[in-house]
Amino acid sequence: MSETSLLPRAHGAAVLSAAMRSTPDDFQLDELPAFEPSGEGEHLLLTVRKRGQNTAYIAKQLAHWAGIAEMGVSYAGLKDRHAVTTQRFSVHLPKRIAPDIAALDDAQMQVVQSAWHNRKLQRGALHGNRFVLTLRQVQGEREAIEQRLQAIAARGIPNWFGEQRFGRDGANVAAALAMFGHVQAEDGTLLPAPTSRRRLRNDQRSMLLSAARSVLFNRVLGARVAQGSWDSALQGEAWMLDGSRSVFGPEPWSEALAERLARFDIHPSGPLWGVGDLRSADQAAALEQGALSDPQSEALRQGLEAAGLKQERRALRLRPQGLDYRWLEAQTLQLEFALPPGCYATAVLWELGDVTDAGRFNVGMRADA
């Protein structure tokens, strides 16, 4: 397995090539909140529109503005720097006295809404994210592109973890291997990693654990896509309820399951690796174990188990909600859609074709690192 190998496309060969994010306005994201503010309490909810800055930087600015420690500022999820995004932050102000909110507004961020709430904002506390993406220098037949978009809307896409989870050139996965005591030689051989005295911060460790889990999931999903079963049932399937983390099965295939699968009420699932038995069995479990039988995957699995993570599941299939498109110019295509928390817009782009992302790197779904 090579560093640059990419996962398969479920809908066939690429139908376009394009460029994205020559300007932050080409990538717009708005959080879809999970609740309305209570109007009382000691947590000030600020809805911030930011441009060209990442979430951690804005959180630091808010802490400085409020005169509190950074841990007093919370948010539901991390948003990209190279974009125009709208997201909520909660600022803990026990005395319910807020500095001048207008002082926060500048070219990089604007507060578009503020309200008090009785609890701090928790990670993942949102319904999802709505994206408006502008692709420029589009090459490809318009009819084929539109047919692919219609197929994506009808059938969905594989629920890949995006390239940004793994860092540039898969650096986060290599760092996770090192954290687990391994280094990979050019020929793929795993060797003991040199002993390091450097202690990782909790957030760094969490990032590397997530990268390790994500690349293992992508390898299983890649095997299902190659087999053509990413959106259908295998014997021993562990099913995930749409819009939740609830998992059930395996159970015998039935007409009722087929109907639920067809209406996107349930999805096949894959492992987020950790301690414990796989929820799948039979054919599904055999595929998962086979996809993760190489030495690097085995090392990542053992490292995640040693770190104490528990076995969880993630849906293999994802259907973008409200997918719409418009041609702004002959070679400029704008896409709009919503995704659940933890799902990646780059997974949608990957099913269309090869997109060069000026804000980051080429859009690709990594099988290996």
UniProtKB/Swiss-Prot annotation:
GO terms for molecular function: RNA binding; tRNA pseudouridine(13) synthase activity. Signal peptide: none annotated. Keywords: Isomerase, tRNA processing. GO terms for cellular component: cytosol. The keyword Disulfide bond does not apply. It is an enzyme of class 5 (isomerase). GO terms for biological process: tRNA pseudouridine synthesis. Residues 156-318 form the TRUD domain. Pfam families: TruD. The active site is at D80. It catalyses: uridine(13) in tRNA = pseudouridine(13) in tRNA. Gene3D superfamilies: TruD, catalytic domain, TruD, insertion domain. Its EC number is 5.4.99.27. Responsible for synthesis of pseudouridine from uracil-13 in transfer RNAs. NCBIfam families: PRK00984.1-2 (NF002153). Belongs to the pseudouridine synthase TruD family. This is tRNA pseudouridine synthase D. It comes from Xanthomonas euvesicatoria pv. vesicatoria (strain 85-10).
